[in-house]
Amino acid sequence: MARLKELYHKEIVEQLTKDFGYSNVMQVPKIEKIVVNMGLGEAIQNVKILDSAVEELAAIAGQKAVITKAKKSIAGFKLRQGMPIGCMVTLRREKMYEFLDRLINVALPRVRDFKGVSAKGFDGRGNYSLGVKEQLIFPEINYDKIDKIKGLNITIVTSAKTDEESRALLKHLGMPFRH
């Protein structure tokens, strides 16, 4: 079992139940999924850039990435509906906990001048999103094979009803929030 999952079941559930006064174990918020998304606007001119992005995202997440396509045509961006413009991975269960562990303990500390993640990334429904400016912070990425620095968005979807509950859950899991 993943280290964070074990920590969640053994300690965090008990701690959150005490903090928020839940009457039932099923009320305790848990992480449902993590979505890692890489939006590549430059894929409009150069579709080849998507191949390397899919490969990198698969290496980071440990799971095959799907190519996302444009929902609408936007003339200003020379974009047609259905054109490939990015890639994403949805992680659940064991892989989700392993990815979160790597993100918190390995990748985020490698960010230059890292002071913690912003506490403003909550959406009001108990989900948290953060942006990563470069994919090089992940140890799975080979520095020599990088043709272009690409950023990515990471969304952590929780079953929490409020941002306060979600923040407490992530803090117990070790997410380094700025003060």
From Swiss-Prot:
The domain of life is Bacteria
Keyword Membrane tagged: no
Which InterPro entries does this chain map to?
Ribosomal_uL5, Ribosomal_uL5_bac-type, Ribosomal_uL5_C, Ribosomal_uL5_CS, Ribosomal_uL5_dom_sf, Ribosomal_uL5_N
Q: Name one GO molecular function term.
A: structural constituent of ribosome
GO CC list:
cytosolic large ribosomal subunit
Entry's Gene Ontology BP terms = translation
Report keywords, A-Z. Ribonucleoprotein, Ribosomal protein, RNA-binding, rRNA-binding, tRNA-binding
Its biological function?
This is one of the proteins that bind and probably mediate the attachment of the 5S RNA into the large ribosomal subunit, where it forms part of the central protuberance. In the 70S ribosome it contacts protein S13 of the 30S subunit (bridge B1b), connecting the 2 subunits; this bridge is implicated in subunit movement. Contacts the P site tRNA; the 5S rRNA and some of its associated proteins might help stabilize positioning of ribosome-bound tRNAs.
As for family, the record states: Belongs to the universal ribosomal protein uL5 family.
- What binding partners and quaternary form does the record give? Part of the 50S ribosomal subunit; part of the 5S rRNA/L5/L18/L25 subcomplex. Contacts the 5S rRNA and the P site tRNA. Forms a bridge to the 30S subunit in the 70S ribosome.
Record protein name field: Large ribosomal subunit protein uL5
Q: Which organism is it from?
A: Geobacter sulfurreducens (strain ATCC 51573 / DSM 12127 / PCA)
The major lineage groups are:
Bacteria, Pseudomonadati, Thermodesulfobacteriota, Desulfuromonadia, Geobacterales
